[in-house]
A protein has these predicted regions:
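Repeated loop/turn-to-beta-strand initiation elements of outer-membrane beta-barrel proteins
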Residues: 66-71, 105-109, 133-141, 151
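Membrane-embedded beta-strand positions of outer-membrane beta-barrel proteins
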Residues: 42-44, 71, 96-98, 114-118, ...
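Solvent-exposed loop/turn segments connecting transmembrane beta-strands
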Residues: 44-55, 82-90, 117-128, 163-164
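Flexible, solvent-exposed loop segments that connect beta-strands
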Residues: 33-40, 71-94, 112, 151-164
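Gram-negative outer-membrane beta-barrel proteins
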Residues: 48-52, 77-83, 104-108, 124-126, ...
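Outer-membrane beta-barrel "beta-signal"
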Residues: 94-100, 164-177
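Short glycine/proline- and aromatic-enriched beta-strand/turn motifs that initiate or cap beta-hairpins
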Residues: 27-69, 96-98, 103, 120, ...
Length: 177
C-alpha cells in the first residue's frame, strides 16, 4: 500500500509540472487552429461510441481556407460476453471525411476552429461537428461529436450495431504540420 501512495504522489507532481510548463509557453506565439490551404492536422485521442471506450487517430488536409478532407481510424473495445473473447476486428472503423471550417465566416479568433462535415467509413456513414483550440503554433486540443447514421460496407453480423446509429464523442490532442 505504501508503494501505491508514492506512485499517486508522483503522478500528482508529474501532472503539476506538466501544467506549469504549459503555463510558461509564450503567449506571443501566433497559434492558429486553422491556417487554411495546405494546412495538415494530425489528431489522436479518446473515443466513446455508444458507451464503448476506444481510441481515434486521424488527419485533415486543407484544400482551401474553408474545406478539408481527411481520414480517420476509430477503434472501440468489443467483447463477446457470451464466449468471453475479444473480437478485435469488429471494433474498428476506417473513415474518409470532408469538413467545412467556419473560422473565417464566423470571424473567430485564430486559435479557435469550428468545423462540420460528413464522413463515410467501412462500418457506417454520418455527420460530425467539432472544435479545435491551439495553445501554440503546433499543439492544440480537439473535441468532436459524430452521429453515425447508417451502415455502409462492413459485414457485422454479430456486432452490427457497434457503430450504426450511435453517437461518437472524442477528445484529444492535435498537431499541426
Amino acid at each position: 500500500m505504501k508503494i501505491m501512495k508514492y506512485i499517486d504522489k508522483f503522478r500528482f507532481f508529474h501532472w503539476l509540472l506538466l501544467f506549469g510548463c504549459l503555463l510558461c509557453v509564450p503567449h506571443s506565439v501566433q497559434a492558429q487552429a486553422w491556417d487554411g490551404e495546405g494546412d495538415i492536422k494530425v489528431y489522436a485521442g479518446y473515443a466513446n461510441v455508444g458507451g464503448r471506450s476506444g481510441i481515434e487517430l486521424g488527419s485533415d488536409y486543407a484544400l482551401s481556407d474553408y474545406v478539408s478532407v481527411g481520414g480517420q481510424v476509430t477503434y472501440v473495445n468489443v467483447k463477446d460476453y457470451d464466449e468471453g473473447r475479444d473480437r478485435a476486428l469488429m471494433g474498428y472503423d476506417l473513415s474518409l471525411m470532408g469538413n467545412y471550417h467556419w473560422a473565417e465566416v464566423l470571424k473567430l479568433p485564430s486559435v479557435l476552429d469550428i468545423y462540420s462535415g460528413a464522413s463515410v467509413g467501412l462500418r457506417t456513414a454520418g455527420l460530425q461537428v467539432g472544435v479545435r483550440y491551439n495553445f501554440s503554433e503546433a499543439i492544440g486540443v480537439y473535441g468532436q461529436v459524430r452521429q453515425n447514421l447508417f451502415k455502409t460496407f462492413g459485414d457485422d453480423v454479430e456486432h452490427g450495431r457497434v457503430y450504426q446509429g450511435k453517437t461518437a464523442l472524442s477528445v484529444g490532442l492535435t498537431v499541426t504540420f
